[in-house]
Regions:
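Internal alpha-helical scaffold of NAD(P)-dependent oxidoreductase catalytic cores
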Residues: 83, 94, 121-125, 144-231
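Rossmann-like NAD(P)(H) cofactor-binding subdomain of soluble oxidoreductases
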Residues: 56-58, 64-144, 160
Length: 259
C-alpha cells in the first residue's frame, strides 16, 4: 500500500489528490495550514475554498499534522514555488529519507534558483519534477491531462506512473531536469505578452508571429542554461506553453489581457 501526502491543500493538490483517492489508493492525505479547509474536506467532503461544487472522494483526507510526512512513500509539493525550498529545509526532521519527493510547483525557488538546484546535495530523497498543461479544474472534472515526469534516475518513473495507472493523468518522461524546469517557468512570461497582444490587436497574424518567436527563444534559453531542445516537445514544453498562452483560464494570459 502506498502512503501519499500532498503538501498543500490548494487547487492542484486537491485535484490530483482526488484523482488518486478516486482510483482507490488507500492512504491519500492533504497536509494543510488552513484549518477551515481541513475541516471542510474531512467533515463535508468538499474543499469549500477551491472546489465548492465538487464532492471529493471519501478516501481523501486532510490534516495539519506534519508527522504524516514521516511514513510517506511519495510526497507531492503542491505549494507556491517560492515556498518549496524553505518548506523542505524547515521540515527536514519530518521527512523520511526514502520518500520520493515530486515537485508540482512551477517557478523559481529560493534565491531565484531552479528548485532542483536549491535542493541538490541537501536531501537523500529521490526528487522528481511533474510539469505539464494542467488546469486543476479540468483534472478534478476527470479530463485527460498530460504531465512530464523529470528525474535523473529512471527507476522512479515506473513508481509514479503506476500510481496513476487507469486514471485521467498521462505521462511522458525526461532526464532533462533543467529543461523541464525552465520550460515551466518561461512560458509564463510569453503568456502575459501574448495576452497583451490579443487585448490590443486581436491579430491572428501577429499572434502566430509572436508564438513562433517565443518558441525559438525558449529553445535557445533552455539550451544556453544546460537544458535539452527535445524538452520543448514534451508535455512540459509546447503543451504547457499553448495552454498558458492561448486559454483564457490562464492567470498569466489574463494578466496580459488586463494590462
Amino acid at each position: 500500500m502506498k502512503k501519499v501526502v500532498f503538501v498543500g491543500s490548494g487547487a492542484i493538490g486537491t485535484a490530483i489528490g482526488n484523482v488518486l483517492a478516486r482510483k482507490g489508493v488507500d492512504d491519500i492525505t492533504l497536509l494543510s495550514i488552513e484549518e477551515e479547509v481541513v475541516e471542510s474536506i474531512n467533515n463535508l467532503r468538499y474543499n469549500l475554498t477551491y472546489f465548492p461544487n465538487v464532492k471529493l472522494s471519501r478516501n481523501l483526507k486532510a490534516t495539519t499534522d506534519k508527522s504524516v510526512l514521516k511514513d510517506a512513500d511519495v510526497i507531492f509539493m503542491a505549494i507556491p514555488s517560492v515556498a518549496v525550498v524553505g518548506y523542505l529545509f524547515d521540515n527536514k526532521e519530518y521527512l523520511n529519507p526514502k520518500s520520493i519527493i515530486v515537485n508540482l510547483a512551477k517557478g523559481f525557488g529560493k534565491c531565484d534558483c531552479l528548485i532542483p538546484d536549491c535542493l541538490q546535495g541537501h536531501f537523500p530523497n529521490p526528487i522528481m519534477m511533474m510539469k505539464g498543461p494542467s488546469f486543476a479544474r479540468e483534472i478534478i472534472n476527470r479530463q485527460d491531462t498530460g504531465f512530464t515526469l523529470a528525474c535523473s534516475d529512471n527507476q522512479y518513473f515506473s513508481e509514479i506512473s503506476e500510481l496513476f495507472e487507469n486514471t485521467n493523468i498521462r505521462f511522458d518522461f525526461s532526464n532533462d531536469i533543467t529543461g523541464v524546469e525552465l520550460a515551466s517557468i518561461l512560458k509564463n512570461i510569453y503568456a502575459i505578452i501574448i495576452g497583451m497582444l490579443d487585448a490590443n490587436y486581436d491579430s491572428a497574424n501577429m499572434r502566430s508571429l509572436f508564438i513562433t518567436k517565443s518558441i525559438n527563444e525558449m529553445r535557445s534559453l533552455m539550451i544556453n542554461f544546460g537544458g535539452q531542445e527535445i524538452s520543448m516537445f514534451n508535455y512540459c514544453g509546447f503543451g504547457d506553453f499553448a495552454l498558458t498562452s492561448l486559454n483564457d483560464m490562464s492567470r498569466n494570459r489574463t494578466l496580459g489581457l488586463l494590462i
